[in-house]
Structures are given as C-alpha cells and as structure tokens.
C-alpha cells in the first residue's frame, strides 16, 4: 500500500484521471513503485468503465455467446456470424453519448467512424450503418440543437465515407434532456479464410502505425465517457471530443482491406477509446506477448507533444498492425499509395509488458495484463427488493384514468374521441415520421439497400460477393440478404428492467420476422446511469438478467457490444438526473429470398387483415396500458407495469409470420409497438396510402386498452384473399387461438375505420389527415 503523502500526485490529480484512491494504491502495489505521469494516465483510461467494464463485466458473463452461426463472440473488435455460401458478417454497436452531448456534430460523426473501424479491422467491408438516438423534449431549444447536430454529424460521416445509413430509431423523452444517447451500429461483409484478430504474436515482428497523424484532440476521451456530465461539460470537456475525417477513413478502409489480402498482417487493432494505450495493451495481452513502442516514430500533427499526450490522444482514423517480419515494407507501400501515414513504430517482445520509449528513455513500462485484462472488478450487491419508485409505479391501475366509452374519453373536462387520441399519438415525435432524419442520409450508396428507411420494420441489405460491393452492376443476381434492426423501449425498462429488457429482445426479433428474416445474433449497447448507486446497479443487473433470458429463449446469442454507464447530469439544484435505463439491442437475421419479404404498408385493395398474437377480444395481462405511449403522452403518467414478454408465444408468432412471408402469402407485416394496435393499423395505412375497415369485438370496459394497449406479441399482417384458405389452415395448425381476422384493406386515400360488431364507430380518420399529422410532427418543431 502507498504510504500517506508518498505519492507524487495529489488526490485531485488522481481523481482527474478517473481513479479512486484505492485504485491508485493497487497500481502502486502492482508496479512496486509509484507511476509516472504517463503511466498514471494510461491506468486512468484503461481502468475506466468505458475500457475495462469493471462494474458490468460480472453481469455480462451470463449472456449466451455461442450458437450455430457464431464464428467470433465477445472480446474482439466485432462479432462475426456465418451467413452461408462462404460469406460472414461482422457487426457491432457502440455508443458516443458523452461526446455528442458536448459537441453533437463531431461527437456523432466520430461515433460512426469508430464503429466502422471496428468492422473493417476484422477484415470486413462495411456495408451498412444503423443508429439508435435518444433526446429530450423537442420543445426545448438545446434538445433541438443537439438533435440537429447529431443527425448532421451522422449524415456527414456516413455519406462521405460511402457506407449507407439504412435504418434505426429515434426516441424523445425528458429523461434524456441533459444526456442524449447516440448509439451507432455497423455491419460488414467478408469472405476470408481467416478473420483478422487483435492478438499480437511473433517475437520480433514489427508493429506498424498506420492512418492519420496524432494530435491533442480527444485527450482522455475514455475517462470522460466514464463520468457524469455537469453544467461545465459543454465547455471544459470539449477537448475530449475527437475530430473525424471521413475521406481519410475511406482511404483507410481500402488500404486495410488491401493489406489484409496480402497475408502479411498478423494482427490489427483500431485506435479508438484510449488511443495508443488501448491498442498496444490489448494487442499485447490478447497475444500473451509484449509490445515495445517508440513515440519518436509516431507521426504527429502538433509540436511539443509529451508521452502523456501521445498515449491518451484519441485522434481518429488510426490503426496499429503487427506485420510479418520482412514484409513490413510491402504493407507500408500500400498505405502510402492511399496517401496515408505508415511507419514501423515498434516491435513484439517476449516479455508481456507495454514498454513506451520517448527521446531515448523509457517513458512507461507496465504489464499488459494490468492494463487490459487483470483490471479492477466490482461485484456489487443487487437490491433485494425493487426500489421505491418501481413499487410505487406498480400500484398504478387503470382506475387512475377515466374509463371512457365508445365515443371517447374525458380528459380535463373535455371529451376526446378515440379518433382525436389516435391523431394526437401520431404526432408524438417518438411515433411520428422520421423522414426529416433519414432524408439526410445516403441510404442507397453501394446499391444494396432492398428496403428504404421507414418502409418496413427492419432494414434489408442484399448480399453480394465482397469483390462486387463497390460495383453496382455486378453480382446482382444474388437473392440472399441480411436484415438488421436496432431497438429498445426504455420506458418499459425504467419501470421494470427485467421485463423491459426481455421485451426489447422480443421486439427486435419480431421486427426481423416482419420482413421474413430469421433472427440469428445480437449486439448490445447498455446505456445506464451510475452503477455506484444502488438503484442504477439494480437496473443494470435486472436488465442483464432479462436480456440473457430472452436471448437464450429466442436463440439469438450475444456476439459483443458496448457498455456506457454514468449517463447522468445534474439539475439546477445539483441533484443527479440519470437517463432511463436503455439496453439497446442490435439484431441481425438471414433473409433466404429477398423477393419474398414484406413492408409495413398495405399493398392491395381487398386484402384481408389479420392480427397475430393476443386477439383483441381476449383479456390478458400480456396487453396493458401500463408504461404505454398512450399513458405517457395523453395522460402524462409514467407508471404501471409494462407488458410482460411471453417468449414461447413470441417464438410461435414470429415463426408463423416468417413462414407466411416465405410462402408468398403475406403482402405486409407490421409489429404492434408504441401506441398499440390502433397506431400500427394507422401506420400501415399511411405507409401504403390505403384505408382499412376494421371490426373490433365488443365487450370491453376499457376501449383505450383495446385500441392503445401494448404487448401481446402482436403483428398486423395483410393477405390476398386468394391465399386465405392456405393461410388460415396453417394458422389453425401452428398458431391456434392466437390469430384473428379483423378487417380488410380499402381503397387508396380513403379512411381508417374501427367499428364494433354492434356498429359503434370507435375510430374514423381520413388517411390524408393522418398522414399530414404524422409527417409534419417533427419538422414543425424544428421550423
């Protein structure tokens, strides 16, 4: 243990690096001496939650990570799954929350750049980007600035680098006012015999630094991402935000993929969080070797840089390679040809340490495992009972809001018809059209995007040989495709982390099934508040338990992901305001025949409309008003128990939907999520620009629960009358009691009507008006 007063650093200096006093003592014990300034910084970033997962690692161990498609699981730059026919898919999701809160454009842009590097570092050519975004209330000026800046940053980087942004989700809630969430997911295609991994090997092999130069931008970004934001963050933490160059990244992609084809690359690691420190430590530790690096050889863009700055810089578009000895010049020539930096900056050594040299002296010398694997782990106690806010929320019942009649519901002395309520929900930014967002993205570059953003419940990207990805007119005869979605209902998770997390996985799988894709694997991004607070850790632990159970049940193993904790800000009174717990799930699936898939909009007049899942006339605790968008937006109450996931029913419903699509019976499929059945029907009307005539069984004393209740593993689908007999025969055999024919598709630009079987009209809205309200909701707030 360090003796009092013996440290060359003050408690404030140690705390600035994100280290606790006991962690500093641990460092001294491991080194047998006090660290120097550079070493202190290295430990600070590598022992941050962002890099070492010291609070979350014990919880992540329960995730299923193996499956028939999984080739690479957690621990590498990205997960990899086998798609068949010699093709593999690398995919991963990662957060850039704190940087985007401080500098939204660059924060979001470099988030895209970073996740793309994780993909092509594995040897995969990036084929698509998705994102999950969360902001505060759009009536707030700062929220509008953050929202506009983040979307512009994503568009700038993705469009310039030539990778399509094909889908995602955007949520708005006051819980994210101080701390927005920016999660970026990327996918890449490969057909290599050997996946490029990060573990260094071969004593004497040269270590190459390639890509851009090193500057002082992004200093200590990993530590910054592992602490709460406060009122000074937008000014004081701005230097921790990186600055990206998508054009340079495009060259880096091509150079790296060309270099990998030579067979001269032994290992590769991108320089993301913690920069040179992380890349050297992780490569050494994973390979069981050491790395000797000379900072004097590192190309820099600023003068007078010291080891601390070199090692903690998070300048973008940089990579570290281990090359076969004697073939380094072959690789250097490739990078120079692409206009990039490439130098031999060190070598692999037998002693498992990270040795850093500067101006002829050893600037740092640390065991690799102390930085990368044998890091502090905190096994915290989980609350034995749900916290008070959850117990109070569970006391809520439908009696807290007026019962309503077939005509509508009285709110604050005024009768609101169910038609009025539906139109109001369509204007809620979380539900409303996201066209303002995705019209800024180039979603068709590479010519493989099968379904455009907003047209279906998941995106679909055609699979072509890697050699043809950059040539739009070649390899187009392939019928196989990959589908992807990214999802989370954070209000569910806030009110019940366990059930909410299960529902998140179920919804992601349901979205894939709605386009005919078989879900095969998951990447997760766990966005939570401080784990050092009992409630925050309970939320994290319960959510991980729910994710694990759902992934096992639906056979979607976790291949990797990201943990982003300390997503909290302080209000004017100095009280911490954590975000809603937000475990975002990115899920990928296989589409066997892209000519047999589904969009969410009605396709033909006279098609029959079915509801899969819990029927409308069945009272079930799987369908609830608790935690719904209706309760929050119309009654301004965040309360109640969210719907519980019946994973057996989910699997049955999803398999039935996929089979119907593959048989060519289904014309459309759309899952019932925020806003329940009524909103799902309206969205299908808007997307297809056709009306629908729906019959709703009578007998309910809660029409709002029938119309706007959520849950129940529900999917709204449409089928041609010519396939009715075959479809219903299949339903009777494989999904008895969990399907219902509820109506028909009507003529273009007509009306959505929901009528009881005693001829009471519950909802009657013109498609033109519904479309206008839905389409203009976000744009009108930004005008």
UniProtKB/Swiss-Prot annotation:
Gene Ontology annotations for the cellular component aspect, listed alphabetically: cytoplasm
Enzyme class: ligase
Binding site for Mg(2+) 1: 94, 562
Predominant subcellular localization, coarse grouping: cytoplasm
Reaction catalysis annotation: N(2)-formyl-N(1)-(5-phospho-beta-D-ribosyl)glycinamide + L-glutamine + ATP + H2O = 2-formamido-N(1)-(5-O-phospho-beta-D-ribosyl)acetamidine + L-glutamate + ADP + phosphate + H(+)
Pathway in which the depicted protein is active: Purine metabolism; IMP biosynthesis via de novo pathway; 5-amino-1-(5-phospho-D-ribosyl)imidazole from N(2)-formyl-N(1)-(5-phospho-D-ribosyl)glycinamide: step 1/2
EC numbers, comma separated: 6.3.5.3
Annotated binding of substrate, by residue: 95-98, 117, 242, 314-316, 564
Location in the cell: Cytoplasm
Record Gene3D superfamilies: PurM-like C-terminal domain, PurM-like, N-terminal domain
Annotated region (Disordered), positions in chain: 1-22
One record GO biological process: 'de novo' IMP biosynthetic process
Matching Pfam families: AIRS, AIRS_C, FGAR-AT_linker
GO MF terms held by the record: ATP binding; magnesium ion binding; phosphoribosylformylglycinamidine synthase activity
Matches recorded under InterPro entries: PRibForGlyAmidine_synth_PurL, PurL_linker, PurM-like_C_dom, PurM-like_C_sf, PurM-like_N, PurM-like_N_sf
HAMAP family reported for this sequence: PurL_2
Protein name: Phosphoribosylformylglycinamidine synthase subunit PurL
Provenance organism: Acaryochloris marina (strain MBIC 11017)
Phylogenetic placement of the source organism: Bacteria, Bacillati, Cyanobacteriota, Cyanophyceae, Acaryochloridales
